Amino acid sequence: MVTPEKLVSLALEAMDRAYYPYSGYAVGAALLCADGTVYQGCNIENASFTPTICAERTAFFKAIYDGHREFTAIAICGGKGGKIAGAFPPCGVCRQVMREFCEDDFKVYLVNGKESYEELTLADILPHSFRPREHMQD
């Protein structure tokens, strides 16, 4: 079983792989699939900014490519120069990607330090969200 603490540790490890020459912010994420598999992601920046991808989406897209569709938790960490200075919440685009594949009770661990984190849910960070079922055809 992957504990929240292990997920946090894997997010911190992923942050070390970030490519962030433009913003100066390194971000790492560790995504827990329902079957216990963990996917790590980091932010990867680009000079034109639009093709930049966040750590959370990197982890999700790797997992989705490998066939996973059910997720239980994600740990996210980040900070200027790769130094954690407090919780680093996901951007709006990443929250909407989470909504596409996760239920309200999906756990979101925002890392505050090497050994501390804040536990939230998707419902906490994305209330009144636009859900995939609103697009579904009968």
Q: Can you describe what each PLM-predicted range is?
A:
Residues 1-5, 136-138:
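Basic/polar N-terminal segments that are highly enriched at the extreme N-terminus
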Residues 4-9, 91-95:
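Charged, amphipathic alpha-helical segments
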Residues 5-20:
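Short, basic/aromatic recognition patches
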Residues 11, 29-30, 59, 63:
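Small-residue (primarily alanine) positions within well-ordered alpha-helices
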Residues 40-134:
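Zn2+-dependent cytidine deaminase-like catalytic core
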